[in-house]
Amino acid sequence: MPRRKIVYFINYFENWIEVYKKGAVSQITLEKYYLALKHLTKIAPDVTLNNITRLDYQSILNKFAETHERNTTMDFHHALKGSLIDAYEEGLVDRDPTRKAVIKGKKASKKKRKYLNEFELKLFIRELDLNSNAEIDWLLLLIAKTGLRFSEALGLTKQDFDFENQTINISKTWDYKRKEGGFKPTKNKASVRRIQIDWKLSMQFSRYTERLHDDDLIFVKNKRIFNATVNHRISTICKQLDIEPISVHGLRHTHASLLILTGVSIASIAKRLGHADMTTTQQTYLHIIQELENQDTDKIMRHLAML
């Protein structure tokens, strides 16, 4: 019986990414697979695919878990598991080494705050410098009032605004991670959408963009806008107001949270945010939905007690 050719796990995993994932998943997801490959190369450069056991695989996860939280270890496990299951189905390994894997990890660090309450948001918006052409502050105003993703907001041109009907058309994003930038498709089909804006925001941006051509980008001018720079500006404003800082994505969460708390339906919120389905919205904002359910329960009990 001929001997199996020795194949290193890291080499198989790299080839598996190229064959099965490249061109099939988003660039961000693909980068996560390559990051998993980088960690695997550091942790287990000499582990062979032919002889990998459950013990070997568990040791890889345990080593990774020493410096990462449990959720991150779970993501690492899912990335590797897909390749090993395929290897098992192809007969390259005799059994599934990922079976009954135990996911460990460092103690989770204190969760950063995700959103502002309504009072804090009002203070935040008042603090924005809208009397100048400071692109970042105008960007923050737009995201706070629309819930757009950072890349969606950066991808807006003047012609995406319909000031007469007070709407914004979202059909593309801006690749802010690349030095040269460039337009990219939206995150999913549901992210292509037209959303309503309030009359005040419409008037503000009508004035702000009056000197721009229809195809001019609104926020990206002669230099790149970094996510970190925007987050730093948010942090500066929050500290001035004695508010715990959030991120630019936290402004999107703030927008959605306020809509939920004012009784807007999950279906309408999912459509406005560009979520693929309502499940995504429900899972993301479960804590707020549960808070509302508790408030409703209290109202019901108080009402019944009065009968």
Regions found by a protein language model. Give the residues of each.
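C-terminal catalytic core of tyrosine-transesterase DNA break-rejoin enzymes
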Residues: E89, L141, K145-L148, E152, ...
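Basic, Lys/Arg- and aromatic-enriched nucleic-acid-binding interface segment
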Residues: M74, E89, V93-L154, E164
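Proline-centered turn/helix-capping motifs that create local helix->coil transitions or kinks
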Residues: Y88-P97, F163-Q166, K172, R207-D215
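Active-site/catalytic core of tyrosine-dependent DNA strand-transfer enzymes
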Residues: D198-I243
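DNA breakage-rejoining catalytic core of tyrosine-based enzymes
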Residues: R3, V7, N50, V93-R95, ...
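N-terminal core-binding DNA-recognition domain of tyrosine site-specific recombinases/integrases
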Residues: K5-F13, I17-L92, N131-S132, R224-A228, ...
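Conserved tyrosine-mediated DNA breakage-rejoining catalytic core shared by Y-recombinases
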Residues: G155-R207
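DNA/chromatin major-groove-contacting recognition/catalytic segments
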Residues: F124-E127, K179-K184, Q283, H287-L307
